[in-house]
Structures are given as structure tokens and as C-alpha cells.
Amino acid sequence: MVLQTIDSTFVAGVTTSPEGEFIFKNTAAGDYRLVLSSIGYNTGYITLNGVKRHTDLGPIVLDSASIALEGVTITGSSQISRADRKLVFPSERQMKTSANGVNLLQELMLPRILVNPMNNEIGLSGGGELQLRINGVKAEIDEIKAIRPADIIRIEYHDNPGLRYGNAEVVLDYIVRRPETGGNFGADISQGLNTMWGNYNLYGKVNHKKSEFGFSYYMGPRDFNGMYRDNEEEFHLADGTTLRRLEKGEPSKATMYQHNLNVNYSLQASENSLFSATLRLRGNNQPHWDYKGTLYNANDEADVVDMTDRTDQSWTRPSLDLYYQQDLKNKQTLVFNVVGTYNREKSQRLYQESTLGNILTDIDNNIRGNKYSLIAEAIYEKQYSKGNALSFGLSHTQSYSNNEYRNGHYYETNMHQGNTYIFGEYRGKIDKLNYRLGVAMTRFYYNQSGKDKSTENYSFNPSIVLHYAMSDNSYLRWKGNIYNASPSLGDLSDVEQAVDSFQIRRGNPNLKSYMCYHTELTYEWKKGIFYTNLWGAYDYRPNAIMDEKIQEGNKIVQTWDNQKDWQKLSGRAMLRVGPIRDILQFSFTGGVNHYMSHGNHYSHTYTNWFCEAEASLNYKQFSLFWQINTNWNNFWGETLSGGENIQMLAVYYKHKNLRVGVGAFNPFTDNYKVQSENWNKFASYKTNNYIKESSRMFLVNFSYNFSFGRSFKTAQRKVNNSDNDSGVMGTGK
């Protein structure tokens, strides 16, 4: 039971006795709103005007929430587990100490979820696609920051999403209340104290009758002067020459300005319909991403040259998202979604090698890219008794890109790409066994103007999920699915660009889509304050598109091809304890990834161990949070892409709608770096990238919001789409 003021400010919270009785003590006279919630029942709201010091409310009846009880396994007082999702109900303490939806997500410590405030990101450990939603509507992290914790009913954590979510591995859906009048405004600002780093968020929402108007804006400036790299390369040229070069980096400049704007209008004309229109504008201006240093010939100490590698790039991505949902009789739903996106990208890279003022190598790559895309989707759902459901869907993506490459020569590419996806899925239950059977068909089409040959592929994508409830506290789940992966437009371009004095990057228009086979097994157990999640998976991708390098005269050509196969064995174990006395909570995750990469002319294996840990301490109005992530390294083709070693420590104080805090990134190390390697027999490298300012970076945080109006239950959006592929071939080492 939560007692709030009329503007939703938290006053007090209690739990009922076994007989359902409750009392709020020392409550001043005034106007209040009482929020009553219980697992398995719809949340109730009672407006209390002119409350005296002693008030008897009499019997209160809550309506049964069938949506929360059909085919579920109750695993605790704050969580309900289904076959495809968890319904997570934050505690009063967690909501009270959090300033927004991102802070609350950190407090919940859900499996695989990583919050990286350094990069203003919510992601998955080890990568993979994560979808964020608010009442089913596609959202970005800055929109999640705009959510008041008091408005959150629950968070739906889909760790086993169905076919309609595409290739998403996890979906986080914030189910929030929608004011029928009034609205809310707020700001969340973080600023570095010893370097130019910031995350600035402004947001607002206003409701009038059946309409809702909202906006959110994020700006993230970064200006570092301590970025550099150390690199070791070894080249074996076709004429038998072997060269080993060492690059010793010097501190250089890294500047970046990120901008995200969301403007939304939604109309709920009736309880059975919802229309939403969202205009998004994404942008990133990166005028400096510069490296400089000295190149040494390891076999000849007198062979020394100066190196400069500067990149100036920017992109802008406006999009319009139109969504309509109509609920029909007999638990049927129709959903329509159309998204149009324009992506403009500019990039200039200057690479020079010189000695005594004489330029030996001079590479100037300029790229101008324009991409237009349209995504249209329709979904039908039919709900049956006991949680059984049937769904069908059709989506099509059509894109066109025009790219100009200038590097001493002029290249122009015009590419068309189409992707059609049809699926059907049935979810059912037999006693303690929940199952989900699905099948999808995919068509991929690609054509580059000026080329006679077009590419068209079809694939069959089945999926199956078996979820067995072993007890009220544990379950075992097996999943197997097959899906299609298509080449990016940038990789398909036949343009070539010089990388340095020895290397050339070249696309491959003959790339073909390939199949991905995935299976995983999950065991979960929860009892009281203890939670354990064990997970193992195997991935097999024959004919995967991976990198390769070939000799061509006195040059090494970097390109891509359909290789033999790529495989990965993964294992992960998570233990979470808490909240202890609603004050202390901590979690630990450890795991291993074993990669097997088999190319047409190479074969590599690599094993990576990793761990993650989090701890939070909440006492009265103070909260302390600590997080550490060790390297989760990925190996693809012949390239090892290193993860980040991240630590974060922060302490906050919250008073009503105001929260202030101080924190530090990597407070216990002065050697932040990201490692990467390539194991090719003709041109290998080992690179360490450093940003000095990312170690012992101290910051302050300020969050404030205010709201007005009442709340009511709103319709929930079912799908989201977006296009984030620029269609441009990358440059640089």
C-alpha cells in the first residue's frame, strides 16, 4: 500500500496483515491518493480528499488481473515468471531511492543487463540486440531516463522473446501509468569534474483528455586530450618481404557531440485503440578522433617515421514512426507499424607517414552517404484461455543507399535492398510444460546499380521453446531456433579504400546471406532473497560472412567472404542476494565463451573468461552503488575485439523529487585500455587503445522532476521497428 500526494509524491508505504488490514501512522490532514497493489490483481487507486487525522476506509476490493495469472509460475513476492518473460515489481525502497527508470534498472540487477552511464547505454553482456520499450512503444535510453519511478507499475523482462521481435535477445518493457490530465517535466544532468564529459537529459510530457504530448532531449559532449594507441603489426608480402612495425602512440584529441531528440504524440480514442506518432532525430558529430605517434621497424632501428591518423565523421538520422493498435472482440488484436528513416553520413580520414618533413604516405578518404528506408509491419494476435495464444505477422523493409567515395579516385554506388519476413507462432501449455512453436520465412534481395547480377535468397526459420516449471521456485527452459543473417550494404560495396602504406580495404558484392543455428538451456531458482540463473548455449553459423586478408602484389587486401563456419560455446552463472532488510543487494556473474572460427584459409580457437559484479546499499535517503565488469572479448573471423574493464562507484542523496550525487569511473586504476587483435598470417596486429580521461574520472549528478495530474491504465503497444544501418563501408584501422 502506497500513500501519495495528489501530484504522485511518495508519502508512506506499508504492507497489509494476513487479513488485509493496514494503517498509516502520523499522517497529516490533507488530500491524498492511495495506491493498492498485489500480485495477481489490478492495481487500485483511491482519491482521498480532505482526509482527517483518523479515517476508516472500510472494505476495499481489488479486481483479479487475469493477464498476470494465465500460465505463470510465482517465484517470489516481487517477481512472476512466465515462459517468455518475467514480470518484475520493484520494491517501494527501490522506487524511492531511484530518480528515473535507468537508476531503477540498476537496482533490479536483472540477468545480462548492463547499464553503462559512461557511454549512456543500456546493453547486454557480450553484445546482442536489446529492445527498450515503454508500454510496448519503442524507446531510447533518454526516454527511459524520463520515467518517474512512482509511475512504473512493473517492468516486463523478456529474456526469451518470440519471433515478432526479430533477432532481439532481450526486451525490456516498462509498463507505466498515463496521466489523464497534467503531466511532468524534469532534468537529469551528469558532469565530469576533471574532464569535459557530460550526459544532459531534458524531458516533459503533457496530457489533455485522450491525447498525450511528450518530448525528450539528450546531449552528450566528450572532449578528451589523452587518447592514444600502441600497435604491433607484422606483414608478409607476396615477394617474400617480412616487416614488423611497432607504433608508439602519443596523446591526441578525441571530441564527440551526441544529440538525441524524441517528439511524440499519442491518442487513445477508446479503451480498445491506440495511435502513436514519434519523430526521432539522432545525431553524432565527431570532429576529432585522432591518433599520432611514431612507427618503428623492429628489424632496423634507423627506420623510423612519424604517423598521423585523423578521422572527422558525423551522421544524422531522422525517422518517423507511426503505430496503430486495435483490440477486437474475443481477445484479438491488430497492430500496424510504419517507420521511415533517412540516414546521412559524412566521413573524412587523413592518414600520413612522414620523416623529416617529407610525406612518404598520404591517404585522404572522403565518404558521403545517403540511405533511405521504409519498414512496414502488420501483426495479428489471438489470446485463448490458460495463456495460450496464436500470432501471425508480416514485415517488409525496403532500402536504397547512395554513397560517394573520394580517395584520389571517385566512386559512386547505388544499392537497393529488400527484406521480407513472414511468421506464425503458437504458445500453449500442458500441465507444467509451457511450449512455443514458431515458423518464419525470409526473403532477401540485393542489387547494385550498374551490375547485371542481382541476389535473391529465401530461408526457412523454425523455432521451439520448452519451459518446464519444476516447482514454484524454479524452472528449466530449452530453446532452439534458426534464423537468417544478411550482409550489410557497406560490406556489399565493391569500392576499395587505402588503409595505410601496406593495406587496402575492399568490399565484396558476391556475399550471400547465411543461416544461424542457436540452442540454449536455462535453469533458474529463487527462494527468499536468493536468486540463481544458470545458462549455456551453442551457436553454429555455416558460411558466415567473416573477414579475411589476401596478398596482392606489395599490398595486403582486407575483405569479407562467406567462410566455412563460426561456432561458439557459452556458459554463464549468476547469483543475486537481496534485498537484505530492504537495504543491501549484490550480484555476481561469471562465465566463459569458447570460439571456433573456420575460414576458407584459416582456423582459430579462442577462450575468454569474464565476470561482472554489482552492489547497492540504500539507507534512508542515501544510496551507494558499485559496479565492475571485466573484459568480455568477442572473436569473429580472425579478429579479437576486446571488451572494456569498467568500474563505477557512486553515492546519492534524494529528497522528494530532487536527487544529487557524486561518483567516479574506474576510480582504482589509471590504465584504462581496450585491446584488439587480428591473427591473419599475412597481416596481423595487436592494438591497445587508451583514453587517459576514462580513468579516475569524477562526476556530479543532478536529477529533478515534478508532475501533476492523475493516472489511468493505458493501452500497450506491441511492436517496434528501426533502421540503424548506415549502408556505408567503414574506414580506418
Model-predicted segments: where are they?
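Membrane-proximal, glycine/serine-rich, low-complexity loop/turn segments characteristic
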Residues: E19-E21, K25, V35, N49, ...
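Face-selective signature of the C-terminal outer-membrane beta-barrel domain
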Residues: Q258-Q286, T308-K453, N457-P462, A469-N473, ...
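C-terminal beta-barrel architecture of Gram-negative outer-membrane proteins
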Residues: Y203, G590-S597, T607-K654, L658-K686
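Outer membrane beta-barrel strand-and-loop segments of large Gram-negative receptors
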Residues: S373-I375, N508, K512, H518, ...
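Outer-membrane beta-barrel translocator domains and adjoining extracellular loop/strand segments
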Residues: G226-T241, H288-V304, K346-G357, N402-Y411, ...
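Coil residues (strongly favoring Ser/Thr
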Residues: D7-S8, S64, K432, S501
